[in-house]
Amino acid sequence: MSQYRTFTASDAVAYAQQFGGLSAPEALVSAQEVGDGNLNLVFKIFDKQGISRIVVKQALPYVRCVGESWPLTLDRARLEAQTLVAHYQHCPAHTVKIHHYDPTLAVMVMEDLSDHRIWRGELIKGVHYPQAARQLGEYLAQTLFHTSDFYLHPHAKKAEVARFINPEMCEITEDLFFNDPYQVHERNNYPAELEADVAALRDDAALKCAVAALKHRFFSHAEALLHGDIHSGSIFVADGSLKAIDAEFGYFGPVGFDVGTAIGNLLLNYCGAPGQLGIREAADAREQRLIDIATLWHTFAERFQTLAREKTRDAALAEPGYASEFLKKVWADAIGFAGTELIRRSVGLSHVADIDTIRDEEMKLSCLRHAIGLGKALILLAPRIENADEFIARVRQYG
């Protein structure tokens, strides 16, 4: 049996030749490390013509941006691969294809998406992909419905929950989303000028109680197999195409967490647009983000209800009207989780380029304050925002 070792570029080429599923594997001759994430090595594998044909991804046993002082389980590579395989089974159009994975080496071989772009980068530049929000809503509906109690037999669902237990990666989420921003912690990362804003988060008892309720749902509601980190940097887009990648945080959790994380990242772009684009372009981009959020939610909710009507196997859950009631709870959860995403990306360890790459420091501070204030408002108001129109009105109200 092979033992874990950190891959070099030549290791990645040899592995792709063996497991890439190409008809002429000997044509693969070189590799380039392209990963900019905190948790993994990612290699593009090129043929003799210099064309990227396949991707090899290997998990590292520590958080890359911190170093070996923050160790991580290598089992997350298995969990990521199996999450993506399961999601591909239910939504192949919008999930990256995994050709092979090895749990011992913590490595997987996947399709190359060089003809796509990372959605976050396109959003920052003001490039609009008209289909993206609808396709993301479709991906979320298909993957979350088909791994939920609506579709799975109870025995199969319980077995899947056990197979996807992911405590170490969930602990990272629990800390970064629900703990660190609301206490003094060395992982937090924000400009000194925001100290009063961050202190106000720590001192807000009502806010922290609402965050505690969201954390409790994250702990205890094993509703469906989540992607677990579905932000705009883990989504590739092209004309007419969207693909989800990077699912090492996959586990069974509340449906609203994936939906809310996606919405939260669109809102981060909304908050950062004035610092990235000209006045008119920023206004157009912000308006489009609100349309994208409404499109994402409506697509998700309508598809989920259609699937529930046509495919629900449990007699009680198939009761007319129940899926609609379930989605009301998902919506409230999603708004709250979107708020936690806004706050943690503004003051916590891991930021987003939508705001961090703004060159004007005063503008960056303004955008960060906007994200923090909007995040706080969404967390507190989530139970009272009944639909997408009300949601958009609230977002406009806070700038």
From Swiss-Prot:
It is an enzyme of class 2 (transferase). It holds the Pfam family APH. It comes from the Bacteria. One of its GO terms (molecular function) is S-methyl-5-thioribose kinase activity. It catalyses: 5-(methylsulfanyl)-D-ribose + ATP = 5-(methylsulfanyl)-alpha-D-ribose 1-phosphate + ADP + H(+). Pathway: Amino-acid biosynthesis; L-methionine biosynthesis via salvage pathway; S-methyl-5-thio-alpha-D-ribose 1-phosphate from S-methyl-5'-thioadenosine (hydrolase route): step 2/2. InterPro entries: Aminoglycoside_PTrfase, Kinase-like_dom_sf, Methylthioribose_kinase. ATP binds at residues 40, 57, 111-113, 246-248. Keywords: Amino-acid biosynthesis, ATP-binding, Kinase, Methionine biosynthesis, Nucleotide-binding, Transferase. Substrate binds at residues 229, 344. GO terms for biological process: L-methionine salvage from methylthioadenosine. Its EC number is 2.7.1.100. PANTHER family: METHYLTHIORIBOSE KINASE (PTHR34273:SF2). Catalyzes the phosphorylation of methylthioribose into methylthioribose-1-phosphate. Homodimer. Belongs to the methylthioribose kinase family. This is Methylthioribose kinase. The lineage of its organism: Bacteria, Pseudomonadati, Pseudomonadota, Gammaproteobacteria, Enterobacterales. The gene is mtnK.
